[in-house]
Amino acid sequence: MAYSARLRKAVGAVRATLSAVELCDVQAPEFAQHGDHAVAADAPLVLVACSGGRDSMALAAVSHIVCTSMGVRCGAVIVDHGLQEGSEQVAGEAANRCRALGLGPVIVRNATVQARGEGLEAAARQARYNELCAAARESGAIAVLLAHTMDDQAETVLIGLLRSRGVDALAGMPQVFTRSGVTFARPLLTLTRAETTGICEDLGVEYWDDPTNGDAVDGELPNDYPLRSRVRHDLLPAIERFAGFNVARHFAESARLARMDKEYLDQRSDEVMGEAVTTVDWPASSAAVSTDTPRACAAGDTNDSSHGVGLMISVRRIAREPEAIRLRVIAHALSQAGVNASAAQIAAIDRLVVDWHGQGGVSLPRGYSANRKKHVIRVCQDGAHANR
């Protein structure tokens, strides 16, 4: 069959992404030659995360075409979150459609979603990734492909700006990332939702429309719809009407540029963190703690024997860096210790570095505090040690 322009674009995008995760290195030599070749039963496996929607069905169809041409097995994993009536049937239909396309193995997993403080959307996402990672490990897949499009990227940028700020909010979703030891990739970030819809039409692939997307709702979506659905249905179209051009493409390109900046800042911050921050588990040695160099918090520095993570940050080392790097080092170090600090708390710790005039420490979540002693900032639980 003759491929449409959008289908050729998708094939190229998937092939380029597989190259990015070094899948081309495992291509069987005979698949570089013209002719019909059977994919070996023990060939490397790629899984497509499939919800049954238009984006993931388009990705499943295109990935099967590309993987087959490379001598790589292409399977699918469908996660049933159990949050909607009839979700089991939707998952089963998605699995059958993937099998009809030739994908195999096709894995259906049931997720347990437990919403806590982070909300239902975040809990469902965490549960989904848990199941995707488990499926990849159990099947031996070398990568899991996700069907996020350019439109999803634009929505992610807007959601990021609503919930946070700075270059991290603008950076959107990475094309390739690792989670719990599993490689994930997003081949369709350069394609629009209209193009994935068209690809399904080109290939005669049926798909399911999630009612929580609100596509059938006239007017503004109520607040009980997921935030992403409201951004997609209401906010993005309103911005496009105001701007008079395709803002999804604009936001997606901005995300690509911001991600390059973010990756450099993260790399540089990691280098500085390795030199400036020491992380230790309690209980530590009872040896005296130097106030000039970062090292373990001593057991005598705490009022109890509880186990936790302490940080020692070298003021002399971190003070030489620009503010953008200092703030990142502090944030990453706190995150490593399991402390989810606010932007205001991170900025207050930075003032202990660059605007030190004997001020008190900074109270942090989980009973942690950050206090400066000479040329070291100590981040420990209980905080009493810092005043000795």
Curated annotation (Swiss-Prot):
This is tRNA(Ile)-lysidine synthase. One of its GO terms (molecular function) is ATP binding. Gene3D superfamilies: HUPs. The keyword Calcium does not apply. NCBIfam families: lysidine_TilS_N. CDD domains: TilS_N. Its EC number is 6.3.4.19. Its main location: cytoplasm. The keyword Signal does not apply. The N-terminal region contains the highly conserved SGGXDS motif, predicted to be a P-loop motif involved in ATP binding. InterPro entries: Rossmann-like_a/b/a_fold (IPR014729), TilS/TtcA_N (IPR011063), tRNA_Ile_lys_synt (IPR012094), tRNA_Ile_lys_synt_N (IPR012795), tRNA_Ile_lys_synt_subst-bd (IPR015262). Keywords: ATP-binding, Cytoplasm, Ligase, Nucleotide-binding, tRNA processing.
